[in-house]
Curated annotation (Swiss-Prot):
It comes from Microcystis aeruginosa (strain NIES-843 / IAM M-2473). The RecF protein is involved in DNA metabolism; it is required for DNA replication and normal SOS inducibility. RecF binds preferentially to single-stranded, linear DNA. It also seems to bind ATP. This is DNA replication and repair protein RecF. Gene3D superfamilies: P-loop containing nucleotide triphosphate hydrolases (3.40.50.300), RecF/RecN/SMC, N-terminal domain (1.20.1050.90). Its main location: cytoplasm. It holds the Pfam family AAA_23. GO terms for biological process: DNA replication; DNA synthesis involved in DNA repair; double-strand break repair; SOS response. The lineage of its organism: Bacteria, Bacillati, Cyanobacteriota, Cyanophyceae, Oscillatoriophycideae. NCBIfam families: recf.
Length: 375
């Protein structure tokens, strides 16, 4: 997989920028707040239709405009493809593949695959469970584009069910009895159906990722530490069986019925899943040093790269955003050695001193200043 061409129009602080990539390794050099991360964010959007930095499209559009455009041409083993993404301040999006507008966003996904590694990824260990769920879901979207639809279905059911629970709670607080609970039973069934699809896929992808992450972690730590990853679904289940998982959902919903009515919200489902990271059987979040936490995240990212390559059949893009500054020299070398020329890599930095001369000689260096890129 090779990204040949990128064109940004009114995206973030880029009014108009065209880039042609002529090397497997591209270094984006510049001071902070010049637009280096914005460029990687544009590629991330093409790969996942998500930004890990903001949730509103209006934050992605240049202030003086009402819409932004991202265009890319990528070469893959099966041929070349062109992608266009139009973002509007209103929130409405248009996705275009090979000059054909698409009705379904999932038909846009999977053309570009990328792994992003930034200083924000340390929140995977330090932050709350939502960060770890988002990480897992972003990986799943690239491995199985249909998952974006599965996740949307679940979130829609969750919103509707929460609205009903809120109404039930409101009426009970007013001293009224909510008469017809059959509607809630219907939402229970839909939550179990859509939620089981989410949780089963999360469990499967983590099962494939764990041995890869453990191998990388062993290599980086010099076999001195044992990494464990544990998926803790909110609804525990034993066998990967559709009916069995759905029954487990309905059983737990029944046991938590009173709590849900009192709180006016759903307390059962994959929106409350957790992923635990353990180092030598101790929680990495509480007991891991900064160095151990960085080693863990580096191992996860290298495992993501490896898993994507195994499943899609070619190396994905690697986007490194100010990550070298977060790693010591030994871990920097581990990362750069793992990359070599295997993955097309875009890396942001404020200075070139972190790179060996052989890296610089084989890299294309762009200077970034106030939303302009100079060759």
């Amino acid at each position: 997989m090779y990204l040949e061409h990128l064109h940004l129009h009114s995206f973030r602080n880029y009014a108009e920028q065209v880039l042609k990539f002529e090397s497997k390794k591209t270094i984006l050099l510049g001071n902070n707040a010049q637009g280096k991360s914005n460029l990687l964010e544009a590629i991330e959007l093409l790969a996942t239709l998500k930004s890990h930095r903001v949730s509103k499209d209006r934050d992605l559009v240049l202030e003086s405009d009402s819409e932004a455009r991202i265009f890319a041409r990528v070469n893959r083993l099966y041929g070349a493809s062109e992608l266009s993404l139009i973002l509007r301040s209103s929130g409405r999006r248009t996705v275009i593949r090979d000059r054909q507008p698409l009705r379904r966003h999932l038909d846009f996904l999977g053309v570009i695959n990328a792994v992003q590694f930034s200083s924000l990824d340390l929140d995977l260990v330090r932050g709350g469970p939502e960060a770890r769920r988002d990480w897992l879901d972003t990986l799943l979207i690239q491995l199985e584009p249909l998952y974006v639809h599965i996740l949307q279905q679940y979130n829609q059911v969750l919103r509707q069910r929460n609205a009903l629970l809120k109404e039930i709670r409101k009426q009970e607080l007013e001293g009224k009895v909510y008469g017809d609970l059959s509607q809630l039973k219907l939402w229970d069934l839909q939550l179990a159906e859509t939620g089981s699809r989410v949780t089963r896929r999360r469990a499967r992808v983590l099962q494939r990722l764990i041995p890869l992450a453990q191998k990388w972690h062993e290599s980086i730590s010099g076999k001195t530490e044992l990494l464990e990853l544990q998926y803790i679904p909110n609804v525990p289940w034993v066998e990967d069986d559709v009916n069995g998982v759905q029954r487990a959902f309905l059983d737990k919903i029944e046991t938590r019925r009173l709590a849900e009515k009192q709180l006016g919200t759903s307390v059962v489902g994959p929106h409350r899943d957790e992923v635990d990271f353990l180092i030598n059987q101790n929680p990495a979040k509480s007991y891991g040093s900064q160095g151990q936490q960085r080693t863990l995240v580096l191992a996860l990212k290298l495992a993501e790269l490896q898993l994507l390559e195994q499943i899609i059949g070619e190396p994905p893009l690697l986007l490194l955003d100010d990550v070298l500054a977060e790693l010591d020299i030994e871990r920097q070398n581990q990362l750069l050695d793992a990359i070599e020329d295997r993955f097309q890599t875009l890396i942001t930095t404020t200075h070139l001193s972190s790179f060996e001369s052989r890296w610089l000689q084989s890299s294309q260096v762009f200077s970034v200043k106030k939303g302009h890129i100079f060759y």
